[in-house]
Amino acid sequence: MNVNELILDKVRSLIFTDLADGSVIGRLTKLEEPSLQTAAEGEDITDAQGALITKLFRAKTGKFTANNSLFSVDLLALQYGADKELASESDKIIVPIEEILTVENGKITLSHMPSSEIRHIYKLESGQLATKYTLGAAASETEFSISDQEITVPTGITGKIYVEYEYESANAVRVKNSAEKFPEAVGVKIFAIFKDMCNENVKYAGTIVARRGKIDSSAIETALTGTGKHSFSIDFMKDYCDDSVDGADLFSVIIAE
């Protein structure tokens, strides 16, 4: 097979792999505006009159950039150099929550069991925080009391109450952004689909393989909107510990039927 000009149908997915065992540690499937870039430093070699004899290039670099259509927790963890923590029954995650609850018979019931003491609740008026009430041993005109998930509001209070608290969850995910942790080197494979230019029913599988890559953490922007994209950039690197010919590879482009 000796293919040349093809139609790039789409970049199907991208995976990040652990350098130690090759396991997949992240996968993206909604890639937009993918771009593969290479660059090198050039130096002009001239004669005594300044005429160009040749040009030498060195320090070649490779980079892949794209936007993921959806917010990705896997990508966020890789960008922050963090682990994706999964909660369980034996290792729960503390989750902050806010609730707006309607007073019924002088009480409100929280959706979750608080993991720590709730010291304040707030009366809402026109959707805004109006009056702050403090925890007491028993409900009074200025204090509320709490038993498990049930709060007895101050005497005579009706309407909406705002409560902010924390609870333990066995069904949660957490990614921490530490000031002292940065992205680690990973393997990268980008899977694409090509079509024959003369017969679009003939398809080819394309793969971009980088043995070593690192997510660029110099500037990470995560759009916190429904229509925002999760952008990222990966720098490809040669393997300095591999003295073979393949060790100098930044990446390979492979196309097969």
Which ranges hold each PLM region?
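Conserved short "hinge" loops at termini or chain/domain junctions
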Residues: V24, L28, A39-G42, A139, ...
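Beta-strand elements of well-folded, non-transmembrane domains
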Residues: N68-S72, Y167-S169, A192-C198, R212-A219, ...
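Extracellular interaction modules
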Residues: R58-K63, V153-Y162
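Short, ordered beta-strand-loop transition motifs
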Residues: F57-A59, I100-E104, S140-D148, L224-G226
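Mixed-charge, glycine-accented linear interaction segment located at domain edges/termini
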Residues: S126-G127, E143-D148, V153-G156, Y204-E257
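Solvent-exposed edge beta-strands and adjacent loop segments
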Residues: M1-Q79, K132, G206, A210-S231
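Beta-strand secondary-structure signal
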Residues: K63-N67, Y162-E164, K189-F191, S231-D235
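Extended beta-strand solenoid/passenger and fiber regions
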Residues: D74-E141, E166-G187, I193-Y204
